[in-house]
Amino acid sequence: MKLPNYDNEHLIFGLFFMLSNKLQVLGDSFYEEITVKQWFVLVVIDTFKEEYPSLSDVAEMVGSSHQNVKQIVNKLTDKGYLQIVRDENDKRRSLIKMTDKCEKLQRDYKEKENEFMTNLFKGTKDEDLKNVVEVFLRLSDNIEEMKNE
């Protein structure tokens, strides 16, 4: 791939969008049942192993608006992958629970997902991946600071 003659910051900024678009197209063809954005919401919900997250918890972790995440959660609920339950400690609060159908989807795709990740990061050293994670976390912190200015 031939890169334009820009400084690294501008190249990286543009590459974020390009990779995001390519991953969305590839991801949407990966699953028959769900979109890649729906998959990401499921992954985020799954990280809350010990307790069910609220919509706000998921929206914050996804990095999207409450309204956008609610639309995705509603679609996943309609498809039977999620269930909305009341918080037993605060009946005003709704929590998101993965269903057995969702857990089956995860099991059915586990091997295919592992193969996808292996192919996606083929030829990339562990040290390089660690550096990318550090840079992404730093960028995330910078974005939060910029939002609060």
What is each of the regions a protein language model found here?
Residues 16, 42-45, 136:
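Hydrophobic structural patches
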Residues 8, 37-38, 101, 128:
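N-terminal positioning helix adjacent to the helix-turn-helix/winged-helix DNA-binding module
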Residues 16-19, 23-27, 62, 105, ...:
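Alpha-helical linker/hinge and terminal dimerization helices associated
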Residues 1-32, 79-81:
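N-terminal leader segment of winged-helix/HTH proteins
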Residues 24-65:
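N-terminal helix-turn-helix DNA-binding core of bacterial DNA-binding proteins
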Residues 74-133:
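Charged, amphipathic alpha-helical coiled-coil/dimerization segments
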Residues 1-4, 127-149:
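C-terminal regulatory/oligomerization modules of transcriptional regulators
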